[in-house]
Design a protein with these regions (language model features):
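Conserved phosphate/ATP/ADP-binding segment of small-molecule kinases
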Residues: 159-249
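Conserved post-catalytic alpha-helical subdomain immediately downstream of the catalytic base
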Residues: 230-231, 254-317
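Short acidic, glycine-rich surface-loop motifs adjacent to enzyme active sites
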Residues: 146-159
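Active-site metal-binding loops of divalent metal-dependent hydrolases
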Residues: 20, 155, 267
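Conserved phosphate-binding/catalytic loop of the ribokinase/pfkB sugar-kinase fold
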Residues: 95-102, 109-144
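Substrate-binding N-lobe of the ribokinase-like
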Residues: 2-5, 35, 39-105, 312-313
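Positively charged, low-complexity intrinsically disordered leader regions
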Residues: 1-31
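Structural motif
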Residues: 15-17, 119, 148-151, 180, ...
Length: 321
């Protein structure tokens, strides 16, 4: 089953709309303290750029062969060009809107000896205006008939307002297009009526203002009912995942070693949505996403999953189940 599904990934078209970011890493060694101030001097050995935020969701989809439309806001600056040029060839960037009044979001990290010493952020707080919203919606309308799914990747940077999110969700519903969301708890009411959301356990509890002692299944069902969702997939770290569909499906974790959880949520929503769009049931899609999540947490930094890794890992977990 998994091989046939993954073979179909190359036929799937997905639009990702969300907070695009560029992650910059400056790697080096610390051998002395600066004479100018009591701070370490980092001798730089490597500098690299990695797709972050919603751009990492896109990168995960592209790595598995999907055809991806990228939607979001960037500045009219050099970092926007770096971000756009970093996308794989199977990513269409025509839905990206370049604006004058804010910079492309960049997170620069200085790392020495596997230790993060400093992070510098280039971003400004904003909410998308009506004109920008209308452009994004009109661009999406031009492609909606050919799409299998839309992912809304919310990092609470001001793009996915309630107005824009509801217009996107309604457009998807009218055209029988799956729409999934990785939401921040404070914005979850923006996404009423989506096909599915993929919060982690902490986010799920915060979204319904549940006490820590409340049963996770009650929380999951509350989320589904309150926000009129078809399904909810709650990621639970070492406890695995729980899918709230017509039934409750507990999916145990399998990750052998956890090195870095950076971007794991991006991988989960990417694979969950892609598998569903390719013909899996929600439960099958959750199991495939679980396998993918287990792979990326075993890698250092923001990572993607290959088709080969996903097939092998899925078969190792589920072939005897």
């Amino acid at each position: 089953m998994i091989s046939r599904l993954i073979e179909n990934f190359k036929n799937i078209k997905i639009a990702v709309i969300g907070d695009l970011m560029l992650d910059e890493y400056i790697m080096g060694k610390v051998e002395r303290i600066s004479p100018e101030a009591p701070v370490p001097v980092v001798k730089v050995t490597e500098e690299k750029f990695v797709l972050g935020g919603a751009a990492n969701v896109i990168n995960n989809l592209a790595a598995l062969g999907a055809n991806v439309y990228c939607g979001g806001l960037v500045g009219k600056d050099k970092n926007a060009e770096k971000l756009i040029n970093a996308f794989p060839k199977n990513v269409d960037c025509n839905l990206i809107l370049k604006v004058d009044n804010r910079p492309t979001i960049v997170k620069k990290r200085v790392i020495a000896g596997h230790q993060q010493l400093l992070r510098l952020d280039w971003e400004e707080e904003f909410y998308i205006n009506e004109d920008e919203e209308n452009i994004i919606i009109e661009n999406l309308k031009n492609h909606i008939k050919e799409l299998n799914a839309v992912i809304l990747s919310d990092y609470n940077k001001g793009l996915l307002t309630k107005s824009l999110s509801q217009k996107i969700i309604n457009l998807c519903r009218e055209n029988n297009v799956i729409v999934t969301v990785d939401p921040k708890p404070k914005n979850i009411s923006n996404f009423v009526g989506a096909s599915s959301i993929t919060p982690n356990k902490k986010e799920a509890y915060a979204a319904v203002e549940a006490s820590p002692s409340e049963n996770i299944d009650i929380v999951g069902e509350k989320l589904k009912e309150k926000y009129n969702l078809d399904t909810v997939l709650v990621t639970r770290s070492e406890e695995g995942m729980t899918l709230y569909d017509k039934e409750i499906h507990n999916i145990p974790t399998y990750a052998k070693e956890v090195y870095d959880v950076t971007g794991a949520g991006d991988t989960v929503i990417s694979v969950f949505t892609l598998a569903k769009a390719a013909g899996a049931t929600w439960e099958e899609a959750a199991k495939i996403a679980n396998a993918a999540g287990g792979i990326v947490v075993g890698k250092i930094g923001t990572s993607t999953v290959s088709e080969k890794e996903l097939i092998e890992t899925y078969n190792n977990i589920y072939s005897n189940n």
